[in-house]
């Protein structure tokens, strides 16, 4: 399992893309990325495009935390639906389709 401290720049394969930077004002804590080869310790539902920000529904997770994963192609990872971070499979194609809607 890969533990990533805040504000570091390293390469991690995610859904066919590579992650350039993972930034957070808070320490990473919790679950895992829903892919066999990548484990990132942060709440997956907090990953977001600015227009699609989502929070965990659990009271313990409600805060001003902001997590952002920057991909090498310049896109941020899309927000995943709440409660599906352990089973949701996001393919490179779906990431590209989602990302393209924000490039107008």
From Swiss-Prot:
Q: Which residues cross the membrane?
A: none
Upper lineage ranks? Viruses, Monodnaviria, Shotokuvirae, Cressdnaviricota, Arfiviricetes
Q: Where in the cell is it found?
A: Host cytoplasm; Host nucleus
The record's function comment reads: Plays a role in modulating host cell signaling by binding to and degrading host RGS16. Not necessary for virus replication.
Put simply, this protein is called Protein ORF3
> Quaternary form?
Interacts with host RGS16.
Motif Nuclear export signal, per the record, lies over: 1-35
Keyword match Zinc? no
Question: A Pfam family this protein belongs to?
Answer: Circovir_ORF3
Chief location of this protein within or outside the cell = host cell
Entry annotated with the keyword Transcription = no
Keywords from UniProt, A to Z, are:
Apoptosis, Host cytoplasm, Host nucleus, Host-virus interaction
